[in-house]
Amino acid sequence: MKKTSTFQNGLIWFGAGVSLAEILTGTSFAPLGMAKGFAAILLGHISGCAMMLLAGLIGGRTGRSAMETVKMSFGQKGGLLFAFLNVLQLVGWTAIMIYDGALAVGGIFAIGRWVWCLVIGALIIVWIAVGVTDLGWINKITMAALFILTLVLCKVIFFSGNAMVGIDGESLTFGAAVELAVAMPLSWLPLISDYTRDAEKPTQATWVSVLVYGAVSCWMYVIGMGAAIFTGEYDIAVIMVKAGLGIAALIILVFSTVTTTFLDAWSAGISAESLSAKLNGKKTAIAVTVIGTAAAILFPMDDITGFLYLIGSVFAPMIAVQIADHFILHRDRFAVAADARNLVIWLVGFIAYRLLMGVDTPVGYTLPDMVLTVVLCLLAEKVKPTKQM
């Protein structure tokens, strides 16, 4: 497989950041107001992107896919658990993204949500068929169009003389808002090494990927929050129609959905290869897209906050164990069947995260949970040092 340039990796993660799911999640921050909402978005993204960076660096240094790096901490069979959970979350994301895209486009051209689900699903399959290293000029044109259209969206929301409107709806605490901001980069954490491992300069590509994604993701959250605060409107498609964007709105909604969801489906295929050597990554990615399209047609997926918190509870303690092993303890358990100690520590971290959800902390739940998990790893190593293999 030919190597990807740092610029190509930046484009890939720009596409991941320009996402309807991120804009829609941003609308949830409106009750906090612009200042507190922006602070929560920034704090959450700094925390989440730091973890994403470390995960990408592990993959870049070792040349292994995301789920193969997990086996370095949890062993061959232990790593299969997380590969399976990752495939599940990616099938979920594929369905959610197709659902959101079809719902938004349906607000502009009302010909039935299921039709748009099929159109978006078909385009994702085309993206998969072309492949991540051969997208080249297609990605460049798409990203340029998305960039221009998001600037137009910013102008409509922030520079049209709109006054702030009263926000109704459920109250969101600052800590819960931080956690919603952490959740997006955290959801990409089990994927980033699938791309940095194929980079010409893995370390440079990882830094660029995370910085680009972090900046664009914050931007999308702010667009969503601003839309709710300044226009009182939570439906981005409606805002675009009111602004007279029409076909331009259709383009940005469809292609932002395709470029983001492609990454979910593609990485689901790569993770599936970790489950069984018999599985072909590209074919599995296409199968995931078909399943996601069917789910988007059949099931409502309007509120994804519970899904985001579930992702956090699974993958925050997982990456905490990896960080402790790779960067502090320098343990490599890739050759063992399963590392029972790390699996128990992960389970404690998972339970701790779920319990922390009942406590309102100013830094959310992920950071305290990760600190606890890393400390447990260090204590366990001190009590019973790992035998060199």
Which residue stretches match the model-derived regions?
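Hydrophobic transmembrane alpha-helices that form the core helical bundles
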Residues: 78-113, 258-274
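Membrane-interface loop-to-helix entry segments
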Residues: 115-157, 168-169, 206-213, 308-320, ...
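Membrane-interface "cap" regions at the ends of multi-pass membrane proteins
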Residues: 1-36, 48, 134, 173-178, ...
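C-terminal membrane-solvent junction of multi-pass transporters and transport-like membrane proteins
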Residues: 3, 169, 320-389
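Transmembrane alpha-helical segments of multi-pass small-molecule transport proteins
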Residues: 12-17, 82-87, 108-131, 144-154, ...
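Membrane-water interface regions at transmembrane-helix termini and the short interhelical loops
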Residues: 27-31, 57, 96, 100-108, ...
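Extracellular loop-to-transmembrane helix junctions
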Residues: 27-57, 78, 213-215, 368, ...
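Juxtamembrane transmembrane-helix boundary signature
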Residues: 42-74, 81-87, 381-386
